[in-house]
């Protein structure tokens, strides 16, 4: 039995030795990490004793020399950095609060590694440079160029709504007509200038700014009050123009109605006179016919008509013996 046990133990020992060797090798692989992985959208930079020996931007699994080669990975995708809101005076010395955001990417990974090395350093440097560029560009341009991108507000023909050319607008209350300033560049053009100014300073860092976007522009309290007052003034002018146009339309329609009224009254008067003439002619014919048949009755009838017209307005006391009343008291 003892001899058989020694034989089994002799066969197990080589297996254990092999397992130990394999375990040591696997542990060495894990500890030394001779492999590195480049994912899509990444750039790898390999250094040896601090010196750059190569770069690689192709996705895949690669081998390096442990302890000798160090792998630094960076993204090739767009990154974003938000600037700090800052109060800046425009060319007119009107203070506004400007807040921007920017998109950037690593253009030259070697320059980036040698000059900055980390994202934290890159964010800090980019933010400082862009904030400085924003200040430089804003201070030499007018407020209208900062807040507007086109002259569309000037080119729009408001007279289409009012049937009155804008150049002929007049206001009864002496209000001054406000005009929008014509911009020379516009906000989008200023954003491109800021990007270009920032790129001129960042080219030595292997960084390129893709674009700068104005997230927000806030007026100071004084400027905001001035803008609101101008808006109210413009709205009042448009309202006054509406009223003036309405009054003009009203006068035009009243004139037409008055002319139509006069025309209708004239036609009605002519028709009434015609009918009256016909009636008088017929009455005269009837009177003539009646007179021919009974002159005495005709005289009596005409006297009654005279009494009816004259007596109600007579305030004097008249005698019944007068010739005037012969038809009343003689019969």
From Swiss-Prot:
GO terms for cellular component: membrane. CDD domains: SPFH_HflC. The chain crosses the membrane at residues 18-38. It is a single-pass membrane protein. SMART domains: PHB. Its main location: membrane. Keywords: Membrane, Transmembrane, Transmembrane helix. Belongs to the band 7/mec-2 family. HflC subfamily. HflC and HflK could regulate a protease. This is Protein HflC. It comes from Treponema pallidum (strain Nichols).
């Amino acid at each position: 039995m003892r001899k058989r046990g020694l034989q089994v133990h002799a066969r197990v020992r080589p297996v254990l030795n092999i397992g130990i060797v394999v375990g040591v090798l696997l542990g060495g692989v894990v500890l030394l990490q001779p492999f590195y992985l480049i994912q899509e959208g990444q750039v790898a930079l390999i250094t040896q004793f601090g010196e750059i020996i190569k770069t690689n931007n192709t996705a895949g699994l690669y081998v390096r020399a442990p302890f000798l080669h160090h792998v630094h990975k960076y993204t090739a995708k767009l990154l974003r950095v938000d600037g700090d809101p800052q109060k800046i005076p425009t060319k007119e010395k009107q203070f506004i609060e400007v807040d921007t955001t920017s998109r950037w990417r690593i253009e030259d990974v070697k320059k980036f590694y040698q000059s900055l090395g980390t994202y934290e350093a890159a964010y800090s440097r980019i933010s400082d440079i862009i904030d400085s560029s924003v200040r430089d560009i804003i201070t030499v341009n007018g407020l209208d160029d900062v807040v507007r991108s086109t002259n569309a507000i000037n080119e729009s023909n408001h007279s289409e709504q009012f049937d009155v050319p804008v150049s002929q607008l007049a206001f009864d209350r002496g209000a001054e007509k406000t005009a929008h300033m014509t911009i020379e560049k516009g906000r989008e053009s200023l954003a491109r200038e800021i990007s270009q100014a920032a790129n001129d300073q960042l080219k030595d860092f292997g960084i390129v700014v893709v674009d700068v976007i104005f997230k927000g522009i806030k007026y100071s309290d004084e400027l905001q009050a001035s803008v609101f007052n101008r808006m109210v003034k413009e709205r009042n002018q448009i309202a006054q123009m509406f009223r003036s146009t309405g009054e003009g339309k009203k006068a035009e329609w009243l004139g037409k109605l008055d002319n139509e009224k006069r025309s209708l009254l004239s036609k009605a008067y002519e028709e009434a006179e015609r009918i009256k003439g016909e009636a008088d002619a017929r009455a005269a014919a009837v009177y003539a016919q009646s007179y021919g048949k009974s002159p005495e009755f005709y005289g009596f009838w005409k006297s009654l008509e005279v009494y009816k017209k004259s007596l109600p307005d007579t305030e004097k006391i008249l005698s019944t013996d007068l010739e005037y009343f012969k038809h009343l008291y003689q019969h």
